[in-house]
Amino acid sequence: DLVTHLDTELRISEIEDYSNALNGLQMENHHGTVSKIAAAVDATLPVMRKAAAAGADLLLVHHGMFWSGLQSWTGHVFQKLKLCHDAGLAVYSCHLPLDFHPTLGNDAVLARALGLEPCGTFMKTKGTENGARIETEIARDELAKRLESATGARVHVCAGGPEIARRIGIMTGGAGAEVAA
């Protein structure tokens, strides 16, 4: 089934995460089938409303329903649970296992969007190798152009070091705080 496939592909049981991540199926739907999937970063009430309105049976999120820890089932927490139950919307969350995935993770996806191919990792977070390590030769200005094109955002270059980059590390998300300057 889909949940088993996701759990296996993303190595849910193998990768340590923050205690409130609660990776995997967080809420099942009452009919047990999936024909339409919605995806979002956070499992917020507005996101769940949009997913339900679109007729989704499954909402895939990066930060799940319990990210803030234990909470009483009142207010917006109750509204989220009731909405999902009434709409038949299952919720599946995947945090660090998705971040660290060698082909589906943000680091690998960004590398490919830049026209670069990761050749390994360069750090460990919670005991798991992560961060896309790239060995290439690319001019700083060319890399900045590719980054602007891939992200649609303006890139600010703080030039330093050689004009040609030969080793690049890509680290998305909060784990960048674990890299010493």
Which residues does each predicted region cover?
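Hydrophobic structural segments
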Residues: D1-A181
